[in-house]
Amino acid sequence: MKFRHLLGATVIGLAAPAYAAPGDPVRVSDDLTIDPIVEGRLRYEGVDQPAVDADALTLRLRAGAEIKMHSLSILAEAEGTLGLVNRYNAFPFAAASDQRRPQYGTVPDPMNVDLNRIQLQYRFRHSTFTLGRQRINLDDQRWVGSVAWRQNEQTFDAVRGEAKIGPVTLDGTYAIGQRTIFGIDAGPRQSYQGAFFFAVAGVKAGPANLKGFAYLIDYDEGFFAANSSKTFGLRATAAIPFAAAWKLSLAGSYARQSDYGSNPFDYAADYIAAEAGVGFKGLTASAGYERLGSNNGRALQTPMATLHKFNGWADMFLTTPAAGLQDYYGGLAYKFDGVKLLPGLNAAVTYHRFDSAIGDASYGNEWNASAGFKLGPVGVLAKYARYEASSFGVDTQKFWLEANFTY
C-alpha cells in the first residue's frame, strides 16, 4: 500500500497523545451547573486505489458547554477540523473549493469550522423535549444517524420529543434542516432543507424489543429531490442468555420505502435485514444478511443514515446501486480481559459478500479488521478495509489510525 512515511509519523504522534483529566460539571449554585465539553480526535486515513491514492491527517476539536438548571438545559458546541496533511479529496462531488482535489482519493473530512449543536432541552418525569440544532441517532442508525465516524458530525435543526411509559417508548421528531458532514465549503451540500418527520414507537417484552418506525423525508433542493421518500417498517431485537456465560443475540428488520413529496420518480422497494450472534465471555461470532431492494430502476436509499456502519468500511455503497444491494456477512469479535498494559483491548474481523438485489450480478467482496485499546483517557483505534471488485467499483484498500479523548 502507498501510505509511505505518513504512517510512521502518525504512529509516533499517537503513541504520545495529550492527556486530559476527566471533568465534572461545575456547580455554580444548588440549582445551576455548567458542564464543559472538550473533545479531540487525531486521525490518519490512507486510501489505495488503482488510479488514485490519498493520505489525510486531520485533527477534529469540539468545545462547548451545557448549562443546567432544574429540568431545563442549554447546550452550545462548536466544532472544527484541521487538515494537517492534505493529500486527499474532501468532496466526492463538484465544489468551488480548493478542498476538491480529484487527483487524490476521497476522504470526506474537509477542513471546517461550524456551530455543531445549539439546543434547548426540557426534561419532565419520563419525557424529554429538545429544540434546536441537535444530534439524533435513531435505533441502529440505519435510517437516521449522526455519522460519528467522520470528523464533521451530521446534526439536525429540529424539535424532538421522547417519552417512556412503562415498557413503551415513544420518539417523534420534526426537522427542517440536515447539516451534513461536508461543511462550509460544500456549497448547497453543506445543509439540506425540507420537511422531515421521524417517528419510532417501541415496546419491551422480556428479552425482546419490538419497534415500529416511520420516516417521511421531503427535500427542498431540486438536485437532491430523488432522495425524498417515505419509509415504514418494523425492527425486533432480543438478547437471550443461555447456559453459563453464553448469550444469543437476534435482530431483524423489514421496511417498505416509496417515493414521497418532491421525488419525481415512481418506485417502491423493500428492505430486509437479519442478524444472529452467539457470545461466550469476551468472544462473539455473528452472521447476517441485508437487502436494499430496487423497483422501476430506483433503489432504496438512506441519505440520513450513519452509512459507514453498514455494508463495509471501504464505503463503496454509500449510494445504493440502481439494481439494489445484498450484503452477506459474518465476523468474529473479542474483548480481552485483564491486559493491564492495554486496558479495553478489543479486536474484530468481518467478511462481506456483495451482490445485486435485482439480477445476478456479483459486486465484490470485502474484509474489515479493527483493534482498539485505551491509554489512560485516550482511546486508540486502528482499522483496515480491503474491497475486491467484481462488477462494481474498483479494488480499494483503506487504513485508519486514530487517537481520541473526551474531557
Residue ranges of model-derived segments:
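Beta-barrel outer-membrane channel/assembly domains of diderm bacteria
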Residues: 2-4, 12, 18-136, 159-165, ...
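Short acidic, gly/pro-rich beta-turn/loop elements at beta-sheet edges
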Residues: 48, 73-75, 86-88, 141, ...
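Membrane-spanning beta-strands of outer-membrane beta-barrel proteins
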Residues: 56-58, 113, 154-155, 194, ...
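Surface-exposed coil loops of outer-membrane beta-barrel proteins
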Residues: 88-117, 126-225, 230, 234, ...
